Design a protein with these regions (language model features):
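Short beta-strand segments at enzyme active-site cores
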Residues: 39-42, 124
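Alpha-helix/helix-capping structural signal
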Residues: 8-9, 43, 109, 128
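Active-site-proximal, substrate-binding regions of enzyme catalytic domains
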Residues: 25, 49-79, 87-89
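Short, well-structured N-terminal submotif of metal-dependent ribonuclease cores
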Residues: 1-40, 55-68, 132, 145-150
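Alpha-helix C-capping/helix-to-loop hinge sites
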Residues: 13, 31-34, 51, 55, ...
Length: 150
């Protein structure tokens, strides 16, 4: 089974005070144990780093700590899926043809990575936006607190 994690899951898995920490952390630990193929979109790495280093926590998560989390928990075990320039062009064309704009376009990068990796599950706490972008595969989109890992 291939499972793609989005930023919302990775952030929750790193922040013990996050409301969904337990479910996200369980999925991350199972991924690191090799229970399934762990997949992330390349842009998710940068987005997770950006979010972690700007969360209003005390003490703040320092850039070196955010990098260490990604290095140890994600880069060491996950397959990173990167979009090509042609993928970006096709995605922009599709978004323009459907009149889709604004911040949701960043979620479309995640959906495209999920398609390219042929994942079985796209794990997110952002269900509605992703189901809107990938209606043909809405059943693949799930939240860590709604699905038990293998």
């Amino acid at each position: 089974m291939k499972v793609l994690f989005d930023t919302s899951v990775l952030v929750a898995a790193h922040v013990p005070s996050h409301a969904e920490y337990s479910s996200a952390r369980l999925w991350l630990e199972r991924a690191k144990q090799g229970a399934f193929e762990f997949v992330v979109a390349a842009h998710t790495l940068m987005e997770t780093y950006a979010v972690l280093t700007r969360l209003p926590l005390k003490p703040r998560i320092m850039p070196a700590t955010a990098f260490q989390f990604l290095e140890t928990n994600v880069l060491a075990t996950a397959r990173v899926v990167a979009l090509t320039a042609e993928d970006y062009r096709d995605l922009l064309k599709s978004l323009a043809s459907t009149g889709t704009g604004g911040g949701i376009v960043y979620d479309s990068l995640l959906v495209k990575a999920a398609e390219l990796a042929q994942v079985d599950v796209l794990l997110t706490f952002n269900l509605k936006h992703l189901q809107r972008l990938w209606p043909a595969h809405a059943e693949k989109i799930n939240a860590p607190n709604l699905l038990t890992p293998i």
